[in-house]
């Protein structure tokens, strides 16, 4: 059985997953997707929260809602990738072997790197 591992269950990772699942034979492929967060944040919707058009509930959903049946979803941080041995080591010590690897980990918000960003309006206004 061939093993596909996708790192990152954000927009890119789940789009790849949902495009590949219908075309890969489940008898021949084992698919695992890994993400450190259980929640998906629909970031374009953040713009509309301060104007009352969306609420947090509208833009924050469980990532499991976007994972097709039969796919193994692991909620864990990634420790390292050994590309020569085709292994992904997770923070909890789990090792995932793969034949194919898709890296779609996206970006992380680091507000403290921008002076003034962590002020009193952080996560209460458009900066959320």
Where are these regions (language model features)?
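Beta1-alpha1 glycine-rich phosphate/pyrophosphate-binding loop at the start
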Residues: 1-72
């Amino acid at each position: 059985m061939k093993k596909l591992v996708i790192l990152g269950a954000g927009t890119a990772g789940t789009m790849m997953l949902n495009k590949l699942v219908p075309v890969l034979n489940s008898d021949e492929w084992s698919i695992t997707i890994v993400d450190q967060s259980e929640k998906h944040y629909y970031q374009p919707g953040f713009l509309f929260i301060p104007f009352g058009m969306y609420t947090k509930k509208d833009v924050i959903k469980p990532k499991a809602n976007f994972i097709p049946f039969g796919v193994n979803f692991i909620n864990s941080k990634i420790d390292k990738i050994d590309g020569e041995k085709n292994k992904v080591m997770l923070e909890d010590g789990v090792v995932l072997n793969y034949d194919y690897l898709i890296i779609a980990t996206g970006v992380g918000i680091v507000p403290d790197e921008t002076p003034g960003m962590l002020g009193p309006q952080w996560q209460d206004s458009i900066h959320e």
